[in-house]
Amino acid sequence: MIHLHKRSLLKVAALSALASAALVGCGKKEEPAPAPAPAPAAAAPAPAKEPLKIAFGYVGPVGDGGYSFAHDQARKAIEKEFGDKIQTSFVESIPEGADAERVFRDMAANGNKLVFATSFGYMEPIQRIAPDFPNVKFEHATGYKNGGNVATYDSRTYEGAYLAGIIAGAMTKSNVLGVVGSVPIPEVVRNINSFTLGAQSMNPKITTKVVWVNEWFAPPKETEAATSLINGGADILFQNTDSPAVLKTAEEKGKRAFGWDSDMTAYGPKAHLGSAIINWTPYYSKVVNDVLNDKWTSQHTWWGVKENAIDIVSLAPDVPDNAKAKIEEVKKGLKDGTFSIWKGPIKDQAGKDVVADGKVADDDFMRGINFYVKGVEGKVPGAQ
């Protein structure tokens, strides 16, 4: 039997304690708990995209009731459509000449990235300006010089002229129609001819007299020209000028007339037979959408009845049913491609075929028209 003394017991206890301490010291030292990760900072809001700045240049006042008014109505329509994505401005009554270059250059220099120059006479100024502003897109109405950062666009106004002619041919009592012409360029000559062709489709005895004012917007001259035509036997007047002066004159003289570019009914409600209008909104909407989506390209666009860019509206109550039916027939044909206004045989004043029987004039031919068709009196100014 083994006996342990008190001293021995104390010694064993001490050794035991040291061993325990040593074992504890050999264990892994406990690390402090990591600090919680800071919450992620809120993402900074993306900077607001600046609106596309768009400028319009008009040849007449926006209150002309016709051409410039139609463009400005389309400007307002795209403002409503695109909201804060765009910012528009306009300058009215810009003369076609040296001053036009200054005005359009200022538009480009002032941060506008899309510029609409809405008259034929702005073509050369735009050609001079465009190379200096490669990041600006220029759209020139009724012109033909496109490329680079310049596109051109037009409306087939001759289709509206033809539709008006249908009514005139059905309703004239004198068989003499009158046209107040603005500037003798192919666009206007084409409209005079198409008006006459439309009238002759209803009444082959029609003749058309023309008086030129050599300006787009010149109410006093337009009034004088309209009066001259009425005195010359015309009982229905048509115009390719920008103010309602022709319609007003017809109202005062007890004759009939058409509105042009915009609905002009209010300017001569008794004289008004209908208005051949241009709707620029579809094209302007397309261009803005293309620019916003980096899809814009330089090209020439020529829209008409098919694209809802041309129509005749607000027909007078006394327009006969046969004329209304003919108008609807022609519009349907223009939309589905089964009808062409300039399909031969079409003859000039001398009786020469300018479009052969069964042939359809192409757009290049249409853009270069500088002659009158059979039934139009006088000569095209400047034509050989």
What do the predicted segments below correspond to?
Residues 29-384:
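A residue-level marker of the well-folded mature domains of exported/periplasmic proteins
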Residues 11, 16, 323-324:
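Short hydrophobic/aromatic segments of transmembrane alpha-helices and their interfaces
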Residues 22-25:
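C-terminal motif of bacterial Sec signal peptides marking the signal peptidase cleavage site
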Residues 11-12, 27-29:
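N-terminal helix-turn-helix DNA-binding module of bacterial transcription factors
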Residues 1-4, 15-19:
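Secretory targeting signals
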Residues 6-10:
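N-terminal export leaders
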